[in-house]
Amino acid sequence: MKSVPLISGGLSLFLSACSGGGGSFDVDDVSNPSSSKPRYQDDTSNQRKKSNLEKLSIPSLGGGMKLVAQNLRGREPSLLNEDGYIIFSSLSKIEDDFKKENQSQEPTIGSIDEPSETNSPQNHHGQQYVYSGLYYIQSWRNFSNGKFYSGYYGYAYYFGKQTATTLPVNGEATYKGTWSFITATERGKNYSLFSNSSGQGYSRRSAISEDIDLENDQNNGETGLISQFSADFGTKKLKGELFYTKRKTNNQNYEKKKLYDIDANIYSNRFRGKVKPTEKDSEEHPFTREGTLEGGFYGPNGEELGGKFLAGDKKVFGVFSAKETEETKQKTLPKETLIDGKLTTFSTKKPDATTSTTANAKTDATTNAENFTTKDISSFGEADYLLIDNYPVPLLPETENSGDFATSKHYEVRDKTYKVEACCKNLSYVKFGMYYEDNKKNNKNETEQYHQFLLGLRTASSKIPTTGNVKYRGSWFGYISDGETSYSTTGDKRQDKNAVAEFDVNFAEKTLKGSLKRADSQNPVFSIEANFKNGGNAFTGTATAKDLVIDGKNSQTKNTPINITTKVNGAFYGPNASELGGYFTYNGKNPTDKNSPTASSPSNSEKARAAVVFGAKKQVETNNK
């Protein structure tokens, strides 16, 4: 999308891209050396250092690891490792792999249904938002490179469909569910706990839960493998336990026996921590080493959780999932929206009048209904990763030494190449930007469809300041069209070359006023007025642009001025409302009856279109005046 001149108030304006944000700025005429008005700079007191995550700890909707088999022509163990962990954007990846490997059409064991309210609860313990388990075949062989493998083929996996956006701000929630595991292999090594495997589990192939003589009769107690969790949302701590159940027989009593404790920290709607074995010196099983654990909360209100872990000795990989207990459901834990994931989709493609058929008309109607609209998407709160087609893509800054204020990078997702433009380096709790499918050969978006995003971890309502007037300064991405000509903003590595967003927030009156400006002259393009009088952490209001002219030929009388008045939505992010962000669209429809003959404000322009996303950081006065 190439920028063209924009005319406002009789002046020819050229808008560039994303914003300014760090550094200092004057609130009056900086050319006046005697100015005594204050200067401002970013408040860095609540800056968050981006987590340096290994592959296993990168947040995603789900993932898994393949079962392994022992090379029967050698003695070297087949260990599990982090490189073998696969991030899943869809369970179809497992399905496609099985079509290739299961050529003898062996019957599969387990299920890879994606989470749904209508799926059979027997297979997934009644869970709706995240599943975990095994999916495998019991007969598989491979001869390659002088090696011979024989065993099971399949995956241990977990997968969720909807990340949590609303969570308790205090209090404790308990969850109960299941877990599954796979092990490494070592030739000739056997463990007594895997008594159901006829000597195969661990010595020739990955041992799995079915190799344990588990209780299967509910009359004797709980059955199978059990996971239990307690999440304290006040202290941001997650505790858990992983059990197996020893089957009651004539020779042994029923027993629910713990193998692991879980100790993790909660980060927005994800958690990271450790699994800790309860029997470090056991010779009966391989569950003896501490491991790395990561997972998250799923369902709109965090009704379920799921995740995975890998033992430090690379001998055990586990997956787990659980749902709220009835005890938690009966509690009245204070909950509010804390995680934002917003996606605005718009197309710059003009209709082709020469191919107007009934079928095309229906397609155009569907496209127009979705065009310049915003929807909720799954996100991970910390705003370090964006999901594109359900696959996590890292956002800036990617390294501590990166000097880029905004970034533009290509990523491969499901055989497609996307260009992702993200802003801004100085924002810790909210990120925004745009992505689109890109042809790397000609650096062109041939689909002419674009996606603006906003991700963030909101400030808890109780932590929103109640007094004071605060300035915020940041950046914005935008697209504006008058129906014939358009202009768009794009990011720049240099902070001083980005378009500016400025806001004044009165926390006592719960009002916000802002302006989205050009990068060069600082003249306003959109003005924003909003309030957060409902006492929450979000604001709503109106974004207005008046008498704008987009002129591709730079002649101030060529195109008709446009007027836009539309609803703006946003929120405060980070500790003590240290950042803010928001978005708005305009698709030719008026939020109120601005087109009536008696309307006092200028009529909205029916053919105009706009999509805007912005973010800003709290400012503090500098000592330099």
From Swiss-Prot:
Main location group: membrane
Subcellular location per the Swiss-Prot or TrEMBL entry: Cell outer membrane; Cell surface
Pfam families for this protein: TbpB_A (PF17484), TbpB_B_D (PF01298), TbpB_C (PF17483)
InterPro entries: OMP/PagP_b-brl, TbpB_B_D, TbpB_C-lobe, TbpB_C-lobe_sf, TbpB_N-lobe
Polar residues compositional bias, start-end: 587-605
Lipid-linked residues (N-palmitoyl cysteine): 18
Region (Disordered) location: 25-52, 99-125, 275-298, 584-610
Function: Haemophilus acquires iron by extracting it from serum transferrin (TF) in its human host. Acts as a transferrin receptor and is required for transferrin utilization.
Tagged with keyword Lipoprotein: yes
One GO CC term on file: cell outer membrane
Disulphides: none
Protein name: Transferrin-binding protein B
Lipid anchor positions (S-diacylglycerol cysteine): 18
Biased amino acid composition, Basic and acidic residues: 276-292
N-terminal signal peptide: 1-17
Membrane topology: Lipid-anchor
Keyword vocabulary terms for this entry: Cell outer membrane, Lipoprotein, Membrane, Palmitate, Receptor, Signal, Virulence
Membership in a protein family: Belongs to the TbpB family.
Organism: Haemophilus influenzae (strain ATCC 51907 / DSM 11121 / KW20 / Rd)
